């Protein structure tokens, strides 16, 4: 059996704070502390979603220590950010070697650095869409690709431009061989 968990964690766009947003389309805030509070709430929402995913992974592994698990989707966080790290459960973060079998591995590490991005914002490629797998799936892993060839910058200039109807995220595709 293969467990597939899809995620779409809260974006980094600040959460609405009543009375603080002047123009929600342009992201104009009345005060800096209103923007900071909205950003804080967004990060808390994203982290609480990541925590629930990690709890689900741990429950699956508690029931079946050999479970094959894939967690994939829009994490709205880069590899070194806490939501991704929390879902991975790295031994370096928990300081508990007994949890090594529960670590999830990001498959994007096999993709060259210059091609390792799924989102383009203000001229910078960012890896915010991930596919994480349990270690027992690595023996079946054959490779992955990120199809970011036609990815446009999602800055405000492109956000409302109807000439760019496709997603602002590139798909991550992985191949596994279970024969």
Which residue ranges define each predicted feature?
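A long, amphipathic alpha-helix that forms part
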Residues: 36-65
């Amino acid at each position: 059996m293969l467990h597939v968990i899809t995620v779409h964690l809260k974006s980094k766009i600040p959460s609405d704070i009543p009375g603080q947003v002047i123009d929600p389309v342009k992201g104009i805030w009345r005060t800096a502390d209103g923007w900071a509070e909205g950003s804080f709430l967004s990060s808390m929402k994203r982290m609480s979603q990541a925590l629930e995913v990690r709890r689900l992974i741990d429950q699956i592994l508690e029931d079946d220590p050999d479970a094959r698990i894939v967690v994939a989707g829009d994490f709205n966080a880069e590899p070194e950010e806490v939501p991704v790290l929390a879902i991975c459960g790295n031994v370096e973060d928990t300081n508990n070697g007994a949890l090594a079998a529960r670590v999830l591995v990001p498959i994007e590490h096999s993709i060259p650095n210059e091609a390792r991005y799924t989102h383009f914002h203000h001229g910078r490629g960012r890896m915010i869409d991930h596919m994480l797998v349990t270690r027992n799936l690595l023996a079946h892993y054959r490779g992955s690709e990120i199809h970011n060839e036609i990815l446009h910058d999602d800055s405000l200039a492109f956000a409302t431009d109807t000439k760019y109807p496709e997603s602002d995220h590139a798909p991550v595709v992985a191949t596994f061989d279970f024969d």
